[in-house]
């Protein structure tokens, strides 16, 4: 499978991103039925999209208000494209653009996401977690690979 192109979000991407959030994020956010809901969920965030053959198939949204400490708020791939490395491509693009001071929250019960971030070198911070309306969560922090000697 060919890799996607990762680029900055454009307003014309809103319908595709809305659909992706509704499908891939439904377990977290419930159905997101309109562009206003997507816009509210990502307000003030820097958004990158993954595109293949002119179609947006994933997106990542980063809260940048606490620079240089950035928070990866959303990373979703359309379910029809999951398991193809698109999430890893988006995550690498986020790190390249916003690293090295990145963190995110994930639900403790979301073992798939926890494995995904661990494979990418992110580290769970056992001292930073809590409970929200979705349940127990843990903070995950990006750790740059040590320099090669």
Q: What is the meaning of each model-derived region?
A:
Residues 88, 109-126, 132-135:
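Conserved active-site alpha-helix within GNAT-family acetyltransferase domains
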Residues 138-149:
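Terminal substrate-recognition subdomain of acyl/acetyltransferases
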